[in-house]
Amino acid sequence: MHIAALHQPSQVQLNQDGNLKHFLTIEGLSKENLTKILDTAQSFLDDNNNLINRPLLEGRTVMNLFFENSTRTRTTFEAAAKRLSANVLNIDIARSSTSKGETLRDTLWNLEAMAADIFVVRHSSSGAAHFIAKDVCPKVAIINAGDGRHAHPTQAMLDMLTIRREMKKPFEDLSVAIIGDIKHSRVARSDVAALQTLGCKDIRVIAPNTLLPVGFSEYGDHVRLFNNMDEGITGCDVIIALRIQNERIDSPALSSQSEFYRMYGLNKERLSLAKPDCIVMHPGPMNRGVEIDSSIADGEQSVILKQVTNGIAVRMAVLALSMQGQLQEQGLIDAIAL
C-alpha cells in the first residue's frame, strides 16, 4: 500500500453535499472543511477548557482497530466516543483472527457485520485507511488514526485547535517551526498540510538532512527548510517538537541521540530565540533529553497537556461530523456547531 495510490482523497472523504464522510487525510479538504472541524471541537470545550459531554452518538458503535501500538490516540478516541454516548469496542488485534492468517478484508467485513458505525484505524501501511474506506467498507465511517509515514489527520487538527486557542490570532500572522524527525513523521506531513490550508505563510521545517524527506519542499512557497536549529526558530510563534521515529528508520540516520540533542534539542537557550509568547507543542511520546529538555516540556510555555484535552474535543468533532447526515435526519444537528 503506497501513498502514490491515493488519488483525489476529497472524493472519498466527502459526501455529495460536501460534508465529512470519512476522515483520512488533510489533503483534499478545504479551509472551510478544517474550520468546521475546529469550530465543532470548540463547541465541546467550555471557557475553562473543560470538556462538555453530548449524547449525539447514543446507540452508535465505534470500533477502535489499532494495528500499531498507541496510548494517547487510542485512549482519547475511546474517551471521545464515550463522551458522545457511543458504544466503544477496542479490538485486540494481537489476539484477533488476523494472527491466524485471516485477511484484513475478511476481518473488517466480519466487524462491519456486527453493526459497526465507525472504524477508527491505525495501521503501519501508508494508505490503509484510504483502502478500507474506498474498497473494503465504504458504508462505515473510517477515521484514520495514523497510517505508516503518510498521515495523522486528527493529530494535525488537535494541533491546529491548540494553536488557535492559545495564540488567538489568524494563522496568516503566525510563524510555526516543526523540529525533529520530519522524514518518518506522519504528524509533520499532516501539520504542514493543515497549516497551509488554514493560511499560515511561514512554516519552518528544521532537521538534519538525514531526517528530511525528499520533495518535502513541494508543499509550497510558504514552507522553508532549515538545517540550522537556531536560525530556524528565531522569532517564531509556535514550536512543534517531534521525536525520532526509531521504529521506522531502516538505516542509521544519526550519529547518536546525544549529538542530536546538541544540535537540535529544544532547551532554554534556544527557546529564548523565539518570540516571548511562543508556545511549545509535542504530539508525544516525548524523549526527554533528545528532542526536548524537561525544563521546556514542563515549563510555562509548554501546552503539551492542553493538546491532550484538545485531542478529545477534536476526536469528538470528527466522530460526530462523520455521522452528520444521520444526526440531521434525527433532528440533533442543532446540538453542536455543525
Curated annotation (Swiss-Prot):
SUPFAM superfamilies: Aspartate/ornithine carbamoyltransferase (SSF53671). It comes from the Bacteria. InterPro entries: Asp/Orn_carbamoyltranf_P-bd, Asp/Orn_carbamoylTrfase, Asp/Orn_carbamoylTrfase_sf, Asp_carbamoyltransf, Asp_carbamoyltransf_Asp/Orn-bd. Keywords: Pyrimidine biosynthesis, Transferase. Disulfide bonds: none annotated. It catalyses: carbamoyl phosphate + L-aspartate = N-carbamoyl-L-aspartate + phosphate + H(+). Its EC number is 2.1.3.2. GO terms for molecular function: amino acid binding; aspartate carbamoyltransferase activity. The keyword Ligase does not apply. GO terms for biological process: 'de novo' pyrimidine nucleobase biosynthetic process; 'de novo' UMP biosynthetic process; amino acid metabolic process. Pathway: Pyrimidine metabolism; UMP biosynthesis via de novo pathway; (S)-dihydroorotate from bicarbonate: step 2/3. Carbamoyl phosphate binds at R72, T73, R122, H152, Q155, G284, P285. GO terms for cellular component: cytosol. L-aspartate binds at K100, R186, R243. Pfam families: OTCace, OTCace_N. The keyword Transferase applies. PROSITE patterns: CARBAMOYLTRANSFERASE. Heterododecamer (2C3:3R2) of six catalytic PyrB chains organized as two trimers (C3), and six regulatory PyrI chains organized as three dimers (R2). HAMAP family: Asp_carb_tr. Catalyzes the condensation of carbamoyl phosphate and aspartate to form carbamoyl aspartate and inorganic phosphate, the committed step in the de novo pyrimidine nucleotide biosynthesis pathway. Belongs to the aspartate/ornithine carbamoyltransferase superfamily. ATCase family. This is Aspartate carbamoyltransferase catalytic subunit. It comes from Acinetobacter baumannii (strain SDF). The gene is pyrB.
